[in-house]
A protein has these predicted regions:
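Solvent-exposed beta-strand motifs enriched in subsets of small alpha/beta binding domains
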Residues: 1-69
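A broad "ordered helical/assembly scaffold" signature
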Residues: 4, 29, 44, 74-85, ...
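Short, surface-exposed, charge-dense and proline/glycine-enriched linear segments
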Residues: 40-54, 85-93, 159-166, 186-188
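Amphipathic, charged alpha-helical scaffolds that flank and support histidine-based chemistry
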Residues: 70, 99, 160-161
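Intrinsic-disorder-associated interaction segments
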Residues: 70-73, 77, 105, 168, ...
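Alpha-helical segments in soluble extracytoplasmic regions
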Residues: 73, 80-149
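Extracytoplasmic/luminal low-complexity segments enriched in Pro/Gly and acidic/polar residues
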Residues: 120-188
Length: 188
């Protein structure tokens, strides 16, 4: 019941009852937003309604790259970076939809399959380039890891929508974290 109340306020993530202090408190363990402004807006609203909130920012440094390749290869590499952003954004929106609109596991899996198909369409062309070390190797490694995680959540068996929603949230945070680590490594 408390989880539903918190979700109606805009909370998402892993909600659990904590009685360690002697009183029962409900905590949201993780929630992701596409911008700091969105997170701050939710934080301010929840705080004004008496909900204890802490906000942490996940970011990566801006990186500049010098690529020497033909125009189509450069477009594919730029598309790869955009694909990570789109997957992170798409999963963020999907997580909110699953929780807010009470979608079924099957509906959530279809959304994940669409995100995976788009991700594949933009990143698979990079596999045809010769040499998979350096920048290309980093991009392909992150793609492989994130693709495997998306495929796992899309193909998994879940006991409930809560289990599936938790898996989606984990995948969303995993891909954002893996992408940030890749960009940080490439930025050197």
């Amino acid at each position: 019941k408390e989880a539903e109340r918190l979700r109606a306020l805009g909370a998402a993530g892993y909600i659990f009852a904590d009685s360690s202090s002697g009183e029962t408190r409900y905590r949201v363990m993780a929630s992701g937003y596409d911008s700091e402004q969105s997170a701050k807006s939710v934080k301010d609203r929840l705080t004004s309604e008496g909900v204890e909130v802490a906000m942490y920012t996940l970011s990566s440094p801006q990186a500049s790259f010098r690529v020497t390749a033909d125009k189509s290869a450069i477009e594919d590499i730029c598309g790869a970076f955009a694909a990570f952003d789109e997957a992170i954004d798409g999963l963020g929106q999907a997580v909110i939809r699953v929780d807010k609109e009470s979608l079924s596991v099957a509906d959530g899996k279809l959304i994940c399959a669409d995100i995976l198909n788009t991700f594949d369409a933009k990143l698979t062309p990079l596999e045809s380039f010769s040499g998979t070390d350096g920048t290309l190797g980093e991009i392909l490694g992150a793609y492989s890891d994130c693709r495997a995680q998306l495929d796992t959540v899309r193909g998994g068996e879940y006991q409930s929508i809560v289990d599936f929603s938790s898996a989606m949230k984990y995948t969303h945070l995993y891909i954002a974290s893996r992408y940030a680590a890749m960009v940080e490594k490439l930025a050197g």
